[in-house]
């Protein structure tokens, strides 16, 4: 797959297919021996998308051609998505516990937090994503008879367009503190769009707002294109027949911690390995997982 500046997608193509992949990993992570997340909507959503490989994956029908490496790669990807999901789950529940009642999930994909987290009374959750993605998930959740646990407001727009105006038009209150998530998103944006995303978040945020994201510091000399190919190769060994390479935008990026700090955010950052330790999952130490310690989970507070 090759990206363009104005490309769009549904949940069976391009970047949208990775949202389905992540949902499939959440479904598997929710059914392990000692799950650290619980997403009962992940598997039904994956089945509804209809991509054959991911449907078979959540139904236990995938047999990797190389069982040893394929199963290992699948476990690594599943555990990695599990700790990432738990990090963002804890971020939102912590912000709500501390009194924040307005939340925005950017590039929401098949995220079901508005339905599955324990939101307090008065909580409003905004989900922002491509129109086809929003329409599909809204219709599918209705067909599943799922009810949001917070007041859910969907915003159908590409994040490369004027999404702040669309957010305000849907009732977003710039005077209230907000909890923001940009999960699994930054590598799918051109470098300048990443900066613009954080500028827009900052402009929309009242003091006390919080932000959670993750990024890949360029500390290993590995380009985004190389990381995308490694990502694709791991899934290919599992048996995935969908080309997931070519989806990341290359180019020199701002250091997320430095960029946010320079705009008034108090930032903390932790490597992915620490999250494995926090949530009691074993982290595999070898050359094939070299990029994972370089993934950094970021949380920040404004003002």
UniProtKB/Swiss-Prot annotation:
One of its GO terms (biological process) is methylation. One of its GO terms (molecular function) is methyltransferase activity. Pfam families: LCM. Its EC number is 2.1.1.-. It is an enzyme of class 2 (transferase). Keywords: Methyltransferase, S-adenosyl-L-methionine, Transferase. S-adenosyl-L-methionine binds at residues 129, 158-159. The keyword Iron-sulfur does not apply. Belongs to the UPF0677 family. Exhibits S-adenosyl-L-methionine-dependent methyltransferase activity. NCBIfam families: mthyl_TIGR00027. This is Putative S-adenosyl-L-methionine-dependent methyltransferase MAP_4197c.
């Amino acid at each position: 797959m090759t990206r363009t500046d104005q490309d769009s997608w549904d949940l069976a193509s391009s970047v949208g297919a990775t949202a389905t992949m992540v949902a499939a990993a959440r479904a598997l992570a929710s059914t392990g021996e000692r799950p650290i997340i619980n997403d009962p909507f992940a598997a039904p959503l994956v089945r509804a998308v209809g991509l054959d490989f991911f449907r078979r994956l959540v139904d236990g029908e995938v047999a990797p051609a190389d069982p040893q490496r394929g199963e290992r790669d699948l476990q690594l990807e599943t555990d990695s998505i599990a700790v990432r999901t738990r990090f963002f789950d804890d971020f939102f529940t912590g912000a709500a516990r501390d009194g924040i009642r307005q939340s925005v999930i950017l590039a929401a994909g098949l995220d079901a937090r508005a339905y599955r987290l324990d939101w307090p009374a008065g909580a409003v959750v905004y989900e922002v994503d491509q129109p086809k993605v929003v329409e599909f998930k809204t219709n599918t959740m209705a067909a599943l008879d799922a009810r949001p646990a917070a007041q859910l407001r969907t915003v159908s727009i590409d994040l490369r367009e004027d999404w702040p105006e669309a957010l305000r038009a849907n009732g977003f209150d710039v005077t209230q503190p907000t909890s923001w998530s940009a999960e699994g998103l930054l590598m799918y944006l051109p470098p300048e769009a990443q900066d613009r995303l954080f500028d827009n978040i900052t402009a929309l945020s009242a003091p006390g707002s919080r932000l959670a994201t993750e990024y890949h510091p360029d500390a290993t000399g590995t380009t985004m294109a190389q990381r995308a190919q490694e990502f694709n190769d791991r899934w290919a060994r599992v048996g995935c027949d969908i080309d997931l390479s070519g989806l990341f935008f290359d180019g020199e990026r701002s250091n997320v911690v430095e960029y946010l700090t320079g705009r008034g955010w108090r930032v903390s950052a932790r490597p992915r390995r620490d999250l494995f330790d926090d949530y009691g999952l074993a982290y595999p130490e070898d050359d094939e997982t070299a990029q994972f310690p370089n993934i950094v989970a970021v949380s920040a507070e404004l003002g």
